[in-house]
């Protein structure tokens, strides 16, 4: 039987506010446990929550960016459940009247096509604290620094049909919230976490199968692996005569499998009711107009502009616009270096390889946009060849200065003097007289392969400094003359 996969995602995005959603406590990551928890965060009697307007503004920014309906009247609700790191015994969230309603986000698939993914809603809520198991023998520690950190939970429609589509959607959300500046997107620190709802159904069936939720997956790679593992588990289970049970599961990356965590709760299990300590929040049109006017250029618009303005392919434009920092870096290089396609190649390939090797983001790149742009100028004016440029790039990455100083100090300037190249070629051909005779006696097909040998010998003789274009032109004339 052929199976169709149905995937919906819930993405928990920590908003980059300076203080928590209902208290004035700081939200700095990595502070000593329980040093950023106020009486409000601790759920002490008699204290009252006060809504952080910046969290509301950031949620509205996201809603406008995905062309969503913004809830003009917002009500906060208590989501009741017991967990050791939830001091109040309930979480303040939104149920019936979320701040962001239906919207959509377009994702680029591997074949270059664009698919629209529906966003059901996005609502504001407070994060819980954190249980610490590894540092305590036979017991669990509770860190409430995270309790009360503002979250925007983004709920998608079940529109994805493969793990790769799901990853593309999460990457698009990740890029968007970073462009907007509402989340740092640091998945390792838990700033962006994903719950994956996965089900299967026979191909052609319209009714959904029983879904399982994989909780708190925190990397693109693990999202893909977790979903694929769960898909295979459900297929094997049904084909062996079993039945999928609706439940919450965890992904174990070491065993590459999901395991049962608990039965899946429904909304009525949490006994939602309006929080009596928080008045409804009314969002006025003037507030939204101000936010709309301040929105930055978003990834889809930037991709379109990169193609029209710089003549880049759709693939290159999507890669370069995948983060705001990378897009800004690329444009700064183009501003100095002039050639957009050359800049795109160096940013994506050479710089990308360097950043992967160092394990850092582009805002920590050891080669600045000004340095790279300056080096590309020297390629364009034939001061250095593309091959020598790699040596210059490595030296810049090692902190040896800008392109011009490295070229001068290492004597890397390209030889463009026709007389000097002509003399060098004569000496090289004289030293390889036998190969010259073989070349001249060969047919056209063999000559093509043999020509590369002479080019290699010429570049070796010049220590890579001879202008490759001039070498090719003069060499061809000499061999066929």
UniProtKB/Swiss-Prot annotation:
Function (record text): Allows the formation of correctly charged Asn-tRNA(Asn) or Gln-tRNA(Gln) through the transamidation of misacylated Asp-tRNA(Asn) or Glu-tRNA(Gln) in organisms which lack either or both of asparaginyl-tRNA or glutaminyl-tRNA synthetases. The reaction takes place in the presence of glutamine and ATP through an activated phospho-Asp-tRNA(Asn) or phospho-Glu-tRNA(Gln).
Subunit structure: Heterotrimer of A, B and C subunits.
Family recorded in the similarity comment: Belongs to the GatB/GatE family. GatB subfamily.
Chemical reaction(s) catalysed: L-glutamyl-tRNA(Gln) + L-glutamine + ATP + H2O = L-glutaminyl-tRNA(Gln) + L-glutamate + ADP + phosphate + H(+); L-aspartyl-tRNA(Asn) + L-glutamine + ATP + H2O = L-asparaginyl-tRNA(Asn) + L-glutamate + ADP + phosphate + 2 H(+)
Keyword Nucleotide-binding: yes
Keywords recorded for this protein, A-Z: ATP-binding, Ligase, Nucleotide-binding, Protein biosynthesis
GO MF term list: asparaginyl-tRNA synthase (glutamine-hydrolyzing) activity; ATP binding; glutaminyl-tRNA synthase (glutamine-hydrolyzing) activity
Source domain of life: Bacteria
GO biological process: glutaminyl-tRNAGln biosynthesis via transamidation; translation
Gene responsible for this protein: gatB
Regions crossing the membrane: none
Assigned EC number: 6.3.5.-
Enzyme category, top tier: ligase
PANTHER family per the UniProt record, alphabetical: GLUTAMYL-TRNA GLN AMIDOTRANSFERASE SUBUNIT B MITOCHONDRIAL AND PROKARYOTIC PET112-RELATED (PTHR11659), GLUTAMYL-TRNA(GLN) AMIDOTRANSFERASE SUBUNIT B, MITOCHONDRIAL (PTHR11659:SF0)
Family matches, as Pfam families: GatB_N (PF02934), GatB_Yqey (PF02637)
The protein's name in its UniProt record: Aspartyl/glutamyl-tRNA(Asn/Gln) amidotransferase subunit B
């Amino acid at each position: 039987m052929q199976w169709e996969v149905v995937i919906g995602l819930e993405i928990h995005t920590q908003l980059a506010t300076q203080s928590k959603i209902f208290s004035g406590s700081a939200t700095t990551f990595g502070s000593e446990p329980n040093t950023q928890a106020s009486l409000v965060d601790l759920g002490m009697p008699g204290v009252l929550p006060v809504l952080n307007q910046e969290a509301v503004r950031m949620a509205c920014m996201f809603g406008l960016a995905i062309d969503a309906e913004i809830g003009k009247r917002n009500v906060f609700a208590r989501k009741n459940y017991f967990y050791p790191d939830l001091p109040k015994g309930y979480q303040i969230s939104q149920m019936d009247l979320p701040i962001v309603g239906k919207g959509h986000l377009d994702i680029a698939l591997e074949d270059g096509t664009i698919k629209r993914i529906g966003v059901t809603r996005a609502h504001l809520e407070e994060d819980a604290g954190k249980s610490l198991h590894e540092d305590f023998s036979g017991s669990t520690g509770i860190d409430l620094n995270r309790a009360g950190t503002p979250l925007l939970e983004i709920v998608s429609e079940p529109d994805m049909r493969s793990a790769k589509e799901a990853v593309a959607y999460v990457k698009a959300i990740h890029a968007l919230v970073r462009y907007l500046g509402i989340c740092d997107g640091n998945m390792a620190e838990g700033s962006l976490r994903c719950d994956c709802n996965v089900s299967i159904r026979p191909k052609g069936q319209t009714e959904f199968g029983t879904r399982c939720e994989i909780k708190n997956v925190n990397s693109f790679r693990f999202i893909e692996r977790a979903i694929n593992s769960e898909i295979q588990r459900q297929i094997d289970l049904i084909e062996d005569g079993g039945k999928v049970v609706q439940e919450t599961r965890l992904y174990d990356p070491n065993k590459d499998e999901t395991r049962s965590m608990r039965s899946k709760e429904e909304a009525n299990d949490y006994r939602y009711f309006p929080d009596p300590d928080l008045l409804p929040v009314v969002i006025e049109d003037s507030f939204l107009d101000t936010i709309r006017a301040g929105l930055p250029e978003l990834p889809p618009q930037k991709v379109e502009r990169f193609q029209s303005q710089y003549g880049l392919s759709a693939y290159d434009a999507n890669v370069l616009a995948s983060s705001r920092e990378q897009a800004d870096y690329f444009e700064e290089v183009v501003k100095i270096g002039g050639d957009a396609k050359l800049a795109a190649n160096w940013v994506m390939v050479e710089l990308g390889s360097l950043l992967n090797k160092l394990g850092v983001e582009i805002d920590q790149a050891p080669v600045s946009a000004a340095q790279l742009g300056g080096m590309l100028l020297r390629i364009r004016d034939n001061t250095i060849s593309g091959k020598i440029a790699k040596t210059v790039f490595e030296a810049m990455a090692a902190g040896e200065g800008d392109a011009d100083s490295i070229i001068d100090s290492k004597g890397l300037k390209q030889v463009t003097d026709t007389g000097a190249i002509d003399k060098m070629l004569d000496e090289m051909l004289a030293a390889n007289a036998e190969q010259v005779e073989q070349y001249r006696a060969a047919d056209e097909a063999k000559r093509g392969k043999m020509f590369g040998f002479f080019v290699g010998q010429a570049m070796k003789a010049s220590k890579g400094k001879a202008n490759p274009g001039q070498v090719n032109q003069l060499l061809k004339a000499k061999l066929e003359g």
